[in-house]
Amino acid sequence: MSLLLGLTCLFVGAPPAGAAVNNITLIVPTTPATGADILARLLAQQLNTKLGQVVVVENKPGASGNIGNDFVARAKPDGATLLIASTSFALNSAVNPNLPFDPIKDFAPITLLGTGTLCLVTPSTLAPNNLTEFIALAKSSQLDYGSPGNGTPQHLAMELFKMEAGVNLFHIPFKAAANAVNDLTGGHVSAMIVPMHTVLPLVKAGRLKMLAVMSKERAELAPNVLTFKEQGYPKLQVDVWYALLAPKGTPAGLVQELNTQVMQILKAPNVVSQLSVHGIEANPSASSTLADLLKMELGRWTQVVKTAQIKAD
């Protein structure tokens, strides 16, 4: 991508030896209209304007995101191919340690892009009106929960909840999040942990109850809903996160310049507000901070997978 070319020209007017000369491609390992895709398209638009270069988004879904992840891991480390990763990036490796790539060794972290809030929701027809009542019901009767599939953030977050709350909920995996939410709304599933913005309209319409959020602080879009920490579960802090990664071996100078440019974009008020509409909080970071996050997430979820005895499909 001419990302390297464009960034370099900002300072010296000419590309260095070995600079990339192609367009920038942001690989999204999910389908369109997901959080990662929405963020990628906004970022591409801003980079187009900022760098004066062509920045395109290419969706490569499949295998829980591993097709796109592996594509970037094998790409030439010249800054022309970048990955929009999300929480699943670490979860996949925790569930399946035999992937063709290493999430730590095969990628160069650039920056955290943003975070989203997860929440625990139940059907409006289910009796509990708060977390304490829900846990009591779960301990006295057999409840279940839905998720978009084995090893997804929603699945593992609920397994973590089960461990911390000491309850046993039966897992019902669906092929898609929309299907799971539909069954939840219809009362066919007892509970779900989901990205808050996807169910907030149903909560406001009285069709679902939101019992807790997994963020560190209360969510701006639902300020009256308590965090798990406020309700006695400090370890239940889990965010959906999005990050920008490059193939391992990408020059350190390019990684730093990408970090600088993207950080400026994500701090712009118009970008912050556009992401907020989709339930994403802009949260750029140093590349070292992202590296630490990836290691922490992989360790955390590997332990959850082991304890819950979760196996790859």
What are these regions (language model features)?
Residues 18-105, 142, 150, 166-190, ...:
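N-terminal (or domain-start) structured segment
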Residues 2-13:
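Bacterial N-terminal signal peptides
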Residues 79-85, 144, 190-194, 209-212, ...:
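Paired acidic/hydrophobic, glycine-rich loop segments that form the ligand-binding mouth/hinge
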Residues 89-98, 155, 160-164, 191-225:
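A ligand-binding cleft/hinge motif common to bilobed small-molecule-binding domains
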Residues 74-79, 94-179, 228, 241-274:
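Hinge/capping helix and adjacent helix->loop/strand transition within the periplasmic-binding protein
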Residues 23, 163-164, 252-313:
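An extracytoplasmic/periplasmic, membrane-proximal ligand-sensing/linker region
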Residues 7, 18-22, 46-50, 124-136, ...:
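Short hydrophobic alpha-helices and adjacent helix-cap/hinge residues
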